[in-house]
């Protein structure tokens, strides 16, 4: 029997640190010789969800597509690291149920901190009304109620957050 795969789903506002954290965890897992794939929400949107906008229905569909790919990889023993805002609790719960082996990581940073980190200028554009349906500004973000891991990236270092995720993978039996 092969190794058990798992999906680690990093959720949080734009600029909270999801991509940085998932890439850091990926490096640690690769150093252990483990099969790992990172599914970054921005890249998935560019390649698998180009036609989708940012309505609630389109965001939900994008998350479902990410979940579909993650589930296939997880089933084949891969550790899948998903980095996606995925703002709606019900849709995250839906993909959790679909995938089964699932660890939710809430990458928690205050809106003000996310705006300060905004290298793409998206928050500024959203506040100016140039981008509509922007999560945290004119569209809601529903924080997880019971995530397995909470990383407060305004207070904790990235290495501390990586350690929390690695500890969760160990405690749930996905790593030795």
From Swiss-Prot:
Chain positions recorded as ATP binding sites: 12-19
Function description: Catalyzes the synthesis of activated sulfate.
GO CC terms in record: cytoplasm
HAMAP family reported in the protein's UniProt record: Adenylyl_sulf_kinase
Keywords assigned by UniProt, alphabetized: ATP-binding, Kinase, Nucleotide-binding, Phosphoprotein, Transferase
SUPFAM superfamilies the record matches: P-loop containing nucleoside triphosphate hydrolases
One Gene Ontology MF term: adenylylsulfate kinase activity
Species this protein is from: Synechococcus sp. (strain JA-3-3Ab) (Cyanobacteria bacterium Yellowstone A-Prime)
PANTHER family: SULFATE ADENYLYLTRANSFERASE
Reactions that this protein is recorded to catalyse: adenosine 5'-phosphosulfate + ATP = 3'-phosphoadenylyl sulfate + ADP + H(+)
Family per record: Belongs to the APS kinase family.
Residues annotated as catalytic: 86
Name of the protein described by the UniProt record: Adenylyl-sulfate kinase
């Amino acid at each position: 029997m092969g190794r058990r795969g798992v999906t680690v789903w990093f959720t949080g506002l734009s600029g909270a640190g999801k991509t940085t954290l998932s890439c850091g965890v990926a490096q640690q897992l690769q150093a252990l010789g483990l099969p790992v794939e990172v599914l970054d929400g921005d890249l998935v949107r560019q390649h698998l969800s180009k036609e989708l906008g940012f309505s609630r229905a389109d965001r939900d569909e994008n998350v479902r597509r990410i979940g579909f790919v993650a589930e296939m990889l997880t089933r084949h023993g891969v550790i899948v690291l998903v980095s996606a805002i995925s703002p709606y609790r019900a849709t995250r719960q839906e993909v959790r149920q679909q995938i089964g082996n699932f660890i939710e990581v809430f990458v928690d940073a205050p809106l003000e901190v996310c705006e300060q980190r905004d290298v793409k200028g998206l928050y500024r554009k959203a506040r100016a009304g140039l981008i509509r349906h922007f999560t945290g500004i004119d569209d809601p973000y529903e924080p997880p109620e019971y995530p397995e891991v909470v990383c407060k990236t305004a207070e904790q270092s990235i290495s501390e957050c990586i350690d929390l995720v690695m500890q969760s993978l160990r405690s749930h039996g996905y790593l030795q």
